[in-house]
Amino acid sequence: MKKLNVIICGLVLAATVLPAAAQTTDTRESYQERYERMVQKGGASGLGIETLLNRWLADYPDDADALLGKFLYYYSKSQSSQVVAKEQKKFLGQEPVLSLADSLGKVSYYFEELFYDEALFSRALREADKMIRTYPDRIDLRFYKIAALTGYEKENPDQAVAELRGLIDYNAMQHPEWTHPEYQVTDDFFVAAIQEYCVTFYRYGTPASHEAFRVLAQRMLDYYPDNIIFLNDMGSYYFAVKKDEKSALKYYSRVLKLKKDDNTAIRSCILMYRTSKNVKQEKKYLEMMAKYGESESDRKSSQVRLDYLNGKK
């Protein structure tokens, strides 16, 4: 009888212990490792990803990687790709994947374009807002949302620009202690990140994207009036987009007062005056490039052109 009681007690103990053991919470690291393996195999919205993320967030509701994963899940799931025909030779700054001419010689250009499911994309934005509220000074999380908006809006990046302007204002007025999982966030890092979007919008080549380029460059100059990068951007806007040499020269001249050997401004002035056939002014900036050119090739080619204009052989 005593032996039977021992066995029964052992079974009761096992019944109380085993369920607890089965419910042991996985570590953050184990969730992260499993997530990375699954993403590598099937992408951010692959099979089983949503279930894993739900379990991860149930155990660790504020885990930054899990919150990011949830955003990426819905963003990826919202996307579908199609090859579409367009009349222009470039779309969003990209070359076509294929071009075909019909029997009359009319050429159509085919581009791979992403399209978005509205409901899923809206859910992705809600997840983005949640992770930003939880980690307001994780600058990479803000850029994830902005990148999503940029992809979604394509050549009319109104919401993306609004987010970027808000980010610029927040950075300048609140001076947050930005963090990033991979990089130290310095002033140069922030400037480079904003400039990357300026370049993207400029390359899109549409009226709306060019305006976005101007708005961002001007906003940065509102806070950093002597920033050479954005002064050059404004010069490029007036020269290449608006065909306004007078306004462009104002910005390039400001750059060269701050940095007399700035090759971007010098090269732009050479091109501007060569285009307008103003030989006198072109020679002025060729002399500067021959002296301050960053490469030997720049210096030599400028001198060759200068000699030609001066009638030398």
Across the structure, where does each feature detected by a protein language model lie?
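Helix-start (N-cap) detector for alpha-helical repeat units in TPR-like alpha-solenoids
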Residues: 28-31, 64-65, 139-140, 191, ...
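Terminal, low-structured helical/coil segments at or just beyond the last alpha-helical repeat
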Residues: 203, 207-215, 219-228, 275-313
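Short coil turns that delineate tetratricopeptide repeat
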Residues: 61-62, 133-137, 172-173, 222-226, ...
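N-terminal leader/linker segments that initiate helical-solenoid repeat arrays
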Residues: 21-111, 313
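Alpha-solenoid helical repeat scaffolds
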Residues: 68-69, 140-147, 176-182, 195-196, ...
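Short coil/linker segments at helix-helix boundaries
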Residues: 47-48, 73-130, 134, 144, ...
